[in-house]
Amino acid sequence: MPKLPRGLRFGADNEILNDFQELWFPDLFIESSDTHPWYTLKGRVLNAHLDDRLPNVGGRQVRRTPHRVTVPIASSGLRPVTTVQYDPAALSFLLNARVDWDFGNGDSANLVINDFLFRTFAPKEFDFSNSLVPRYTQAFSAFNAKYGTMIGEGLETIKYLGLLLRRLREGYRAVKRGDLRALRRVIQSYHNGKWKPATAGNLWLEFRYGLMPLFYDIRDVMLDWQNRHDKIQRLLRFSVGHGEDYVVEFDNLYPAVAYFKLKGEITLERRHRHGISYANREGYAVFDNGSLRPVSDWKELATAFINPHEVAWELTPYSFVVDWFLNVGDILAQQGQLYHNIDIVDGFDRRDIRLKSFTIKGERNGRPVNVSASLSAVDLFYSRLHTSNLPFATLDLDTTFSSFKHVLDSIFLLTQRVKR
């Protein structure tokens, strides 16, 4: 019997099958061969001509998976996800540069550097699951609308609809009578039988947390009605990703012995993507420790449909402000809502790092020199793990506060508190 490539095995009837133990849990090996052992330095410095071939830094260490082969799975026609890891001890970059200066009195140079290798810290420890979870929660939710929250906020919604109708009526009357001053009531609030003048802050907060949520609720209910008879395909793929920049600094690079030094920053993008292949089943499901399981009885179905913990949180005053910094709402939504019932056939969790941009400077004896350079990556981090679970949200503090809308919200909320 012939020997099969790594990743395959013979079945009971000598058919060729995937060896999932080898594909999903492979043994890693260490790759230590230096890919760029030399760099060249050519040009003129201090009236001396250089044409040197110099050794690059050694000691390369990369933990990686071996190459394996797969065949399509008979039941689905898809090739299985394989675990792939390329885990360098340090990130490696290749620099090509031209450096020149002229400080007078013979202190000048014009040098060309090719294939100069240097290494930096590898920021491999990252997990952006909290950014992926809301999109999974929304994609596999049994309903677009949050009916529990809509029921909990029903009284406030009715009051707000009454205010909108009152405004429309007053606007119609003002136009009919030709009383343009009375048109101001279209944007004013009404309390205890009196109209109160509007402020920019009140209008903004009403738009953000009154009018827009109302429109979204109406849209979601209409989508649920339109999709009530949809037939979902037998097998689907779904994936979401998130990336964030990370800056690594480097200093004290001396490609030309002690003539000058280089320093700068490298902007890396750390990316996290999670994906699944899944089959749809009849009925509904709930979240259970990273996976979805069918509901067990009508009580569990009703509880997940309402999601009382999320409703209680949504009805808590200023809970939306807390959600700017702590992902409480995302956690309650993921763990308590009602889902479509699916079977996860295959899946992956991938993290990698890619080179995005760089800046570089040179100096000689504290004085800047001219540097034009290009940079390419040699060893970057890559990890793709097989998984059959969904990403899991954990409590996380976010202090970036990068949303301009949240900045405006904060200003107007503080203004309201000060006025009180």
Swiss-Prot record:
What results from changing residue 418 to I?
In strain: TW18
GO CC term, one of those recorded: virion component
Describe what happens upon changing residue 218 to V. In strain: Qbeta_3_FR
Localization of this protein: Virion
Q: Kindly indicate whether the keyword Metal-binding belongs to this entry.
A: no
Does Ubl conjugation appear among the keywords?
no
Q: List the residue ranges of the region (RNA-binding).
A: 158-176, 226-236, 294-298
Q: Could you provide one GO biological process annotation from this protein's UniProt record?
A: viral release from host cell by cytolysis
Q: Which organism is it from?
A: Escherichia virus Qbeta (Bacteriophage Q-beta)
Q: Provide the effect of residue 29 to L.
A: In strain: Qbeta_2_FR
- A Pfam family hit: Phage_mat-A
Any idea which UniProt keywords this protein has?
Cytolysis, Host cell lysis by virus, Host-virus interaction, Viral attachment to host adhesion receptor, Viral attachment to host cell, Viral attachment to host cell pilus, Viral release from host cell, Virion, Virus entry into host cell
Q: What is the effect of changing residue 360 to V?
A: In strain: Qbeta_3_F and Qbeta_3
Q: What is this protein called?
A: Maturation protein A2
Q: What is the effect of changing residue 331 to M?
A: In strain: Qbeta_2
Q: What is the effect of changing residue 138 to K?
A: In strain: Qbeta_3_FR
The record describes the protein's role as: Induces host cell lysis. Inhibits host MurA activity thereby blocking the synthesis of murein precursors necessary for the host cell wall biosynthesis. May be responsible for the attachment to the host pilus. Makes extensive contacts with the viral genome.
